[in-house]
């Protein structure tokens, strides 16, 4: 922009051209966009997201396969309300989802049934705003991405208490039963289905086609086949027999129920498995008539110990496929199967049915990768090859030929983004809907019915609404400041449905892993029970299509770094495992070659020093290790990690100030964060500012001739600036323009500031003059001494907005009413109320003031006939109603800045005719506007096609509307219905076709907008505001509170250096410098050494001098060195390291020792004393114990606990203690008597029995013990 350039900072980074950041909100926006695929034509949509849900559930057939309901396409209409209307009215920002359905009949008997194609309404779906949030019931919410264990196969090892190593392989599918193969202490391998049913693994192998012992042994190449003859077997004496030698015969049995003769195969075991071949049993083998037998190979031939296989065969109760299938069925169902087919069907449906079992793209990819097999990616069910490969891998693992999986490795954990979570919810909803459709199809066999009759729209919306309203991953958005917003949207949680629980999560899951490098921030995570379970994405990290987190690296070939456009590639943790990676700040020459012969690098979890030729990749930037919040801390490399964690978390709690400063010492990420947070108004393209004032910016954008021609919109864009808009955390968004009339703007220019930003940069706090020195003991234990100037000049003043709501209901006794005429209330108390009973904008509010006046009918008794008559003659009596007004709570004081009143349309019979007239008029207006739009559309289309020949224009059913070769004359064009036509390939001329496609697309969008606008107007005329049932009106009052900094407020720097304001000192009493500059803050120097957050000293003693009028960027791990600091402090003419003699403000004398002085960045946090200050005399009591409730929200008391009782006992204060335990706590009779005595001025009565004693007695009686009080 010409007049307002963004802040230019002196950058200390050694890497001057780091890689551009991707959009910080891509994790939300891209995921939702891919879920809906609205910009993709139906025929080009990928099988993912919403399209995949429809593909999986359609077509739907009835039970006799007579009728088929087919899905063709889905689309959405514009939302009924704008974002601001949804927030103020408490509504959900959603769009109507509609689908094109086709119902046809395949039964020749129903020849008269016509195929029906209809647009069916499937209910509203919450729609993501452009800033990556959802508005649900007026509140902004974020769907947090979830980290969970990836589908696939996992190998693990554990040790039994007796010292035996146990091995297991677990297959985790996307959908379906879990199966686990595990060994026990007897070296037998079992298969566990769904962690419950246990069977020898060889039984499963028989059931899936490896019927005989021979098949199973051949699978692993354990045995060799030997011909049965004395001479041949003699060579193998002493070797183990691998498979049973059986003598089989057929026996005829009579079925007792039917009397039929049934043939059954019988077996006799001649020689069992694992018996040694000796002279004694050779004869038995020959007599059995066996042609061949299986002999175990020598250990030297095998190379591996396969005893687990032979041990498992010993435990196997089955001898054939049929027996195995029966055994598995019995294990799963606890009953015998009816027939072979049903037994076989159960096994198939468990692992081999696409409907019941799904490994997903990820599961198939992981299994193929892990086992080195090459099964088609489209095969999403288990195969026999999978099962055999897993068992073979497990045997190798037992023989130490393979290693177990590290479940905390990021190749074994993936991310469920918002799109995938919505896919799961829609899957549940559509499956339910499909069930009801099938039922309705079966019932309406001979009736004429349509897709609309079959589909119930509420099924899907109820599932989706419950997800957004109750799911642990749909969270109330943290909107304290722009950083809090963007961090919340980039958060990854291991908690939630299908994830871990904080009680059972161990240390390993929470710990930092080497694969987190560049993917998950090792610093930013909550303190407390969720530590390590909730993380943040690193600045450069992306989530790939499979849900794995990847990070970018530059390729290095022969010691030379590739700085070309194609030189950067994204690597998942798995792909990076065998690569050697150099640090981002390793010194390079101008050709990109490493200067040093020995380079520090990373290889897996090791940090070797290698030669440049051994390096495969290099970090794109030193910042890539950290998240956005951590990368905003300058000199982070000098801070202890624990304090950096606190610093990252506290920046999110910084309240937006009336006047914010961008930090003098920043890191260079501040501007990108503001741009991507979408909290400011950003230019959408090149253009000129036509008008600016405090609440509106108008910009006329430049457009090409073609774009202007195909558009139906004016190129003047109007932006309304939010003024004192309330956020979820009651902070305010108040934007100011930073452009001027006549300015040229380019795409991406930031046009406003405010809401913790200054001139397009993040500005969470203020730059203040700080001295590290004790001040009369007032900064003991991290307390902060503050200059009164901070209060007087509103340096740390913030505005907070509270919303107060009152509902007007329909009661049994009649309607409630908003009014300023309230019984038994003085005129003085209602002076600020308007006719509707709502307080006027601009009124000052104090505790106890009436905000909204409401009267509600009394419910004493039914009126007598006489009273009814008097009531009818003289109107309402004050006695009929009681005051139900909303009053200001004890801690509220502020100014009313906005009021709203939402009402349902209450039409009498007389009014209904007028409403019909309004609706008719609106319909006529809409038709007129649509006709005008179509006329303009035809005019543009005729001009565009210019009598060109048609290329064969088709509709969505692929029927030709305009035949190929026909001239596109005005007469031909006017007959086309644009809503039903395919918008591509009209004339064969690429440029014309592209413009036609844009023109039709813009026309349809504009037509939908007009229809939506008039639908909304009709809704307002007929129904009024959307309110819940039983509620007639909702009144809202917004009250702004201006909060200056005061004693008890919490403040912090960016390095985890937090403290409470302990004293506000007059400016003249603060320590001052030689030139008379007084300090703004005095901090305790003892807060630095033990906390090891030296970054604050570097920030302070660095360039932080206002004398230079310059700002700095010192990126983390690549910032200013001590030499740089010295250079700039010398330039500013201030002592190195900021050591300066200060003078006492009280006496004017110089202090003995020099103090460290400089300008540092301080924030005011959301923990303010006004919100925490609380006092109670009487209030609510707990129902059972009759003790006062706890906490400010419940207007509770202070708990006088066990240790406090000891203190009073130690002092011998018996009467005070008795009071505490009785009348001040739960002596119900005593406290009312004490209150009465205080009112009357009488002496205090003797305390009675506490209620908690009665509770104890009742509990003991409940155990059957009898007591009586004497």
From Swiss-Prot:
EC number(s) recorded for this UniProt protein: 2.7.7.6
Keyword field contains DNA-binding: no
Example of a GO cellular component annotation carried by this entry: DNA-directed RNA polymerase complex
Keyword Transferase attributed: yes
Pfam family, one: RNA_pol_Rpb2_1
Molecular function (Gene Ontology), one example: DNA-directed RNA polymerase activity
Highest taxon above the source species: Bacteria
Listed InterPro entries: DNA-dir_RNA_pol_bsu_external_1, DNA-dir_RNA_pol_su2, DNA-dir_RNAP_su2_dom, DNA-dir_RNAP_su2_hyb_sf, RNA_pol_bsu_bac, RNA_pol_bsu_CS, RNA_pol_bsu_protrusion, RNA_pol_Rpb2_2
Reaction catalyzed: RNA(n) + a ribonucleoside 5'-triphosphate = RNA(n+1) + diphosphate
GO biological process, one term: DNA-templated transcription
Enzyme class (EC, first level): transferase
Keywords: DNA-directed RNA polymerase, Nucleotidyltransferase, Transcription, Transferase
Stated family: Belongs to the RNA polymerase beta chain family.
NCBIfam families named in the record: PRK00405.1, rpoB
SUBUNIT field: The RNAP catalytic core consists of 2 alpha, 1 beta, 1 beta' and 1 omega subunit. When a sigma factor is associated with the core the holoenzyme is formed, which can initiate transcription.
Function description: DNA-dependent RNA polymerase catalyzes the transcription of DNA into RNA using the four ribonucleoside triphosphates as substrates.
Protein name stated in the entry: DNA-directed RNA polymerase subunit beta
UniProt organism field: Porphyromonas cangingivalis
Organism ancestry: Bacteria, Pseudomonadati, Bacteroidota, Bacteroidia, Bacteroidales
